[in-house]
Amino acid sequence: MQKNVPDPTAPTLIHLDEARSGVPRSVPPMRPRLASGPFNSHEHLFEVKWDGVRAFLGRDRDGLRLVDRAGGDLLPAIPELRDAKIPEGVLLDGEVIVCDSRGRPSYDLLAARLGPKAAKRGRGPIFVAFDLLYEGHRPLLRRPLEERRQRLAALGLADRKVAVPDHLEDDGEPFFDAVEEYGLEGIVAKKRRSPYVPAGRTSDWLKLHVTPRADVIIGGVEIDNERGARRLLCGWTAPGGLAYAGEAYVPPFLARWVDEATRGFASDRSPFIAPVGVRPGLRWMRPLLIAIVAHAGAPGPELEDARFRSLRLDGDAASAVHEEPVEVETVPPVGPAERPRLVVLHSLPFG
């Protein structure tokens, strides 16, 4: 009987951390779990959650690379970042963002830029670097986050192409309030001592959205012949297949676009593992498109009051799962009251 032999080309924590030369094209990204609410903690650093596309920016002997989390080359779509100045032997984890006229990251503006019509609106693009994975051709994945952040800041990268945002210690609750005040997506809380775990979704990193949102798989589209798409039938990746996650309303100004964007993925059968009621105008879908939806945030496996926001440019089925929020104990805030707002301002590339 033949034993299972690991694929030597598949990146793992051991392979990456034992490498002593060269910089990988990318690393399977570490992902946060969902927090039940904002909290203060002496064990965490708090950062702005960016409304962009996860990406890796690196430079080796062959030059600069900008790739998405699946390893796809982003430079043809974002040529403005070809002259980003980072040292050889460095690999950064971060997000590509485009900002609106008020300096706030806008996924919609980024999606328009990366879409088929390449509408170059908004300010940017810019790469927001929040982690340093390689330096001097050597991996830092096992080093604690706090050290990686200090090394990242010491590189002095901040310019018009690359931004290194600030972070806040201890006081996550007032930081979340400041992020909400400025109309940003949310925050991420990261344990100071956490290593970088490729492809890991652990409670060492926790995310919290100002407006609850989720990645879902589009399993069906309800079409109105005059209006276009009216509702999406959403699903989560689950054991055994696609679990029904409820409906998401499609705003009228996106109805025709969603109708056209989903036609090529139509199917003659339901992709869901359990029966879902058929209705007039229903188009079943192959479970390949990932949508971002905003919702009411109520607990449970089905969305409440969900509203379609955008297609996920870098989506994958593994990200479209029902998340159980993590409960975290909080402590009293310790810093100056104005500090959270200042950190938010200093983090914004065009603030």
Language model features with spans:
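Catalytic cores of nucleic-acid ligases and guanylyltransferases
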Residues: 1-351
